[in-house]
């Protein structure tokens, strides 16, 4: 009897170990000897016309190698800086695997409460999950110009390229839905890292995979990530929603890749582990343009 209980205990331990992923970060996500790292600039933006009354915190990472004179590529993050991106980007710039790039991260907007200023109203799902050009307008017309109005501690100007081929956007969960919505609706970003994208019934982003099926392909390169333990709520199944998007991308002939990780949870460390490879994929062949997709199927109307 004791032997059977021991075997049952060991089996349970093995199952639990298999269910918990331990993500090992590569050297690309760690500080390296001989690589110069840049600085963060923190600011608050509260002058939005696109989203009136909102305030948000902005975090800009400027690599040490940036000269303050040449327009730099830009990567825009939702929900603040993540993925150990500052370290990864400086490492990959140093190894000449990606171009000079400035990182711009902003928190979702908050609106100060009329009756209780200490309890602001969160604007996140309204801004991120709504499939419209509005957040893209905010990024292009307000956020990026605001970033360019700032300077580094050494007095260097921040000059961001206006070429869509030099722009990337990323996020996790609703931030990933936002990244897709911005790239799709503005056509001013050509590289997207989407992790655990909320392509579900929060505010309509579940329609995005259908749009990919129906519309002419756009010159955007995508990297998708999700996991078998991603969210599953009354708004939908994140795992299957991301699979549907990948199927749509394949149908339409996009240049994309994906990583669906067994047992990965919603926005866990898997998204950080994959970020260096995502950057390599999204920026491969630069300064060449992201290729225009070749539709695999002809639709007769």
Predicted regions and their residues:
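Hydrophobic h-region of N-terminal signal peptides that target proteins for export
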Residues: 10-18
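Glutamine-centric residue-chemistry signal
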Residues: 3, 18-20
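Sec-dependent signal peptide recognition
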Residues: 2-9
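Non-catalytic cap/lid and distal C-terminal segments of serine-dependent acyl enzymes
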Residues: 20-301
């Amino acid at each position: 009897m004791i032997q059977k209980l021991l075997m049952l205990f060991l089996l349970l331990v093995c199952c639990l170990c298999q269910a918990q992923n331990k993500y090992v970060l590569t050297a690309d996500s760690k500080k390296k000897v001989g690589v110069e790292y840049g600085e963060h600039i923190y600011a608050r933006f509260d002058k939005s016309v696109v989203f009136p009354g909102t305030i948000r915190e902005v975090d800009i990472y400027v690599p040490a190698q940036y000269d303050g004179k040449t327009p730099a590529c830009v990567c825009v993050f939702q929900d603040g800086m993540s993925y150990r991106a500052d370290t990864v980007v400086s490492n990959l710039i140093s190894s000449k695997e990606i171009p000079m790039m400035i990182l711009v991260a902003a928190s979702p907007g908050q609106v100060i409460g009329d009756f209780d200023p200490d309890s602001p109203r969160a604007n996140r799902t309204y801004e991120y999950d709504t499939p419209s050009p509005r957040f893209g307008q905010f990024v292009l017309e307000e956020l990026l110009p605001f970033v360019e109005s700032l300077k580094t501690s050494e007095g260097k100007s921040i000059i961001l390229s206006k070429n869509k081929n030099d722009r990337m956007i990323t996020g996790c969960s609703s931030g990933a839905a936002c990244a897709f919505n911005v790239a799709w609706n503005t056509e001013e970003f050509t590289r997207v890292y989407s992790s655990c994208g909320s392509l579900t019934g929060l505010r309509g982003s579940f329609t995005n995979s259908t749009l990919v099926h129906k519309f002419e392909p756009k010159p955007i390169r995508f990297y998708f990530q999700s996991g078998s333990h991603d969210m599953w709520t009354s708004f939908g199944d994140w795992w299957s929603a991301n699979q549907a998007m990948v199927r749509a991308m394949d149908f339409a002939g996009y240049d994309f890749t994906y990583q669906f990780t067994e047992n990965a949870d919603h926005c866990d460390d898997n998204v950080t582990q994959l970020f260096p490879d995502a950057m390599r994929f999204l920026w491969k062949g630069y300064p060449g343009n992201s290729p225009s997709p070749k539709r695999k199927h002809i639709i007769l109307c």
